[in-house]
Each structure stands twice: as C-alpha cells, then as structure tokens.
Amino acid sequence: ADPRNPLEECFRETD
C-alpha cells in the first residue's frame, strides 16, 4: 500500500 495514495491513506489507521 502506498501511503502517498489518498485512497490507501484513508484505509491506513496507523501513521
């Protein structure tokens, strides 16, 4: 998962 991807960032609960 790419943390720079806004969609993936949505699913990321941890920083």
From Swiss-Prot:
Localization of this protein: Secreted
Keyword rRNA-binding: no
Assigned GO CC terms: extracellular region
Family, similarity comment: Belongs to the flavin monoamine oxidase family. FIG1 subfamily.
Assembly and oligomerization: Homodimer; non-covalently linked.
Cofactor list: FAD
MF (Gene Ontology): L-amino-acid oxidase activity; toxin activity
Post-translational modification: Contains 2 disulfide bonds. N-glycosylated.
Reaction catalyzed: an L-alpha-amino acid + O2 + H2O = a 2-oxocarboxylate + H2O2 + NH4(+)
Protein name: L-amino-acid oxidase Bfon20
Tissue localization of expression: Expressed by the venom gland.
Main location: secreted
EC number(s) per entry: 1.4.3.2
Keywords attached to this entry: Antibiotic, Antimicrobial, Apoptosis, Cytolysis, Disulfide bond, FAD, Flavoprotein, Glycoprotein, Hemolysis, Hemostasis impairing toxin, Oxidoreductase, Secreted, Toxin
Role of this protein: Catalyzes an oxidative deamination of predominantly hydrophobic and aromatic L-amino acids, thus producing hydrogen peroxide that may contribute to the diverse toxic effects of this enzyme. Exhibits diverse biological activities, such as hemorrhage, hemolysis, edema, apoptosis of vascular endothelial cells or tumor cell lines, antibacterial and antiparasitic activities, as well as regulation of platelet aggregation. Effects of snake L-amino oxidases on platelets are controversial, since they either induce aggregation or inhibit agonist-induced aggregation.
Lineage: Eukaryota, Metazoa, Chordata, Craniata, Vertebrata
One GO-annotated biological process of the protein: apoptotic process
